[in-house]
Amino acid sequence: MDDEPDVLAVLKEEILSDAPRCILDTATSYEQASELLASWTYDLAIFDIMGVRGFDLLEKAGKRPYPIPVVMLTAHALSPESLKKSIELGARAYLPKERLGAVVPFLEDVMTYEYGAVWRRALKQVEGFFNKTWGAYWKKPDESFWKAFEEKIASRKE
């Protein structure tokens, strides 16, 4: 779910080129996405953070009787704070829009691995990008959070 139709088109093209039998629903507004979440059960959801109130959708997906694994996607809200909030609200992964070309292996990991393994693998894939974008010390302001999170995901099996 993204407010930019061109991003949805790229996601659809990337996913369907590797998984042509995959069924995709798309929404360009918070209201459309909320209606879809209320009406259907999904194996996975991808929410843009900024334009479609992605954090609100993430909370809704997590409160369902059978929570939906969610990947948060962003360009405008790309920050250590939004990554932290995504984790706190239960996202299974966080992907910068600049990495859309790598979305399929990323989604395969989310569908295949347990929470800790997904985050370990996801952070390993984007750590260089984050260090380049935010600087090598981006975890420093919330050092205790990141230390606790890294311990949590290290203790979970694959």
Regions found by a protein language model. Give the residues of each.
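Two-component/phosphorelay signaling modules centered on CheY-like receiver
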Residues: 5-25
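Acidic, metal-coordinating helix/loop segments flanking the phosphotransfer/catalytic sites
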Residues: 12, 26-44, 52
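Conserved phosphotransfer microenvironments
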Residues: 30, 45-64
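Conserved phosphotransfer cores of two-component systems
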Residues: 38-40, 61-68, 89
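Two-component signal transduction core modules
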Residues: 45, 70, 94-95
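Alpha4 helix (beta4-alpha4-beta5 surface) of REC/receiver domains from two-component response regulators
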Residues: 56, 77-105, 123-124
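Hydrophobic/aromatic residues positioned on beta-strands within the core alpha/beta folds
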Residues: 73-75
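C-terminal output/effector regions of signal-responsive regulators
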Residues: 112-158
